[in-house]
Amino acid sequence: MINLKLIETNFDEFNAKLKAKKVDEGVLKNLLDTYNELKIKKQELENLQAVQNAKSKEVGILARSGADTTLLKTELEENKKLMQTASNLVSELETKLDTVASRVPNVIDDDVPLGKDDNDNVCIKTILEPREFNFTPKEHFELGENLGWLDFATGAKLSGSRFTVLRSDGARLSRALVNFMIDFNTARGFELVNVPFLVNSNTLYGTGQLPKFEEDLYKIRDEDLYLIPTSEVPVTNIYNNEIIPVENLPIKMTCYSACFRQEAGSAGRDTRGMIRQHQFEKVELVSISKPEDSAKILDEMVSCASDMLKELGLPHRHMMLCSADLGFGAAKTIDLEVWLPGQGKYREISSISNTRDFQARRAKIRYKDGKKNALVHTLNGSSLAVGRTLIAIMENYQNSDGSINIPEVLKKYM
């Protein structure tokens, strides 16, 4: 959630930054108007409470002296009714403010490029040259079906479209990747955690998926439980409503999980293969830091994921997302896009974001520095998406006969 006090004092700056994220100016104005109205009504309630306290003391003094208190008691009753009305209005405005504020995205960092869509994302650097093939490279779904690694028909029979059964060496390679990724991340100082795949609505609110993106989630009927869209959600919320001693920062965690998404806005996109699935696996990085350290930690997380791709021998590039392509909670995002020779283009394999204090404000994650409590900064990103890494290896390491070589670093995991 964005800082409402800063909006009040820097409305034009916030408005420009949110406009760059395609947020209508009326949304922010409504938020500010509600915030200011709430402040006024809270002050009116406090004034009525002060009157109530003063008159109550006066009644006590008069009663002890034997004087008539009838008139004052009548005034107290009238004031009490006014207090109740004012209190109800304050509660209504607080609910309205929370509802409006919870749907306003994070503001962008100053160095984020302005843009209208993903065509305006900026390539920072490219790592490893794509391999030159002396044959026409196939896409992963053709390779996988021919080898018996990817069984789309059985996935569809069991669950419907956008589900896949991995078999034989395809399943082994997927498992090898998970173990390799976990070992790589923990060697970089990330603590391995294992979390539930079902979380409650408060947890999803903390990281910003609710209330705005409920249609993309799978909900358990008649329960306050949802399947996680990413392990960022439970891992970040391990520290929900907690105060962390400053000496414990930064906190760096990594987690393997299955992820579940309805992909509500993806009809007609990537309908073949494993690029876009309702259920997929990834290994996540989550960091919690002091505000002044988060920019440096973002760079460290990007380097971790990029170095992993280098070790796997996969050509990729670093893309800074433009304002309009940034996610709801992100202040800044670096995407890593891997080269897929079968498709002849780069595709996202990791998205690493600094949310600054946006999630921390929602989830009430603070740190204690001396006598002062302050909001932490939270960061998250894939290191890496398992299915897309599998795809990238299949396409980049394919041979003319349709066989696939295994990267040297993975052989011990197979």
UniProtKB/Swiss-Prot annotation:
Transmembrane segments: none annotated. GO terms for biological process: selenocysteine biosynthetic process; seryl-tRNA aminoacylation. It holds the Pfam family tRNA-synt_2b. Disulfide bonds: none annotated. GO terms for cellular component: cytoplasm. The keyword Disulfide bond does not apply. Its EC number is 6.1.1.11. It is found in: Cytoplasm. Homodimer. The tRNA molecule binds across the dimer. Consists of two distinct domains, a catalytic core and a N-terminal extension that is involved in tRNA binding. This is Serine--tRNA ligase. It comes from Campylobacter fetus subsp. fetus (strain 82-40).
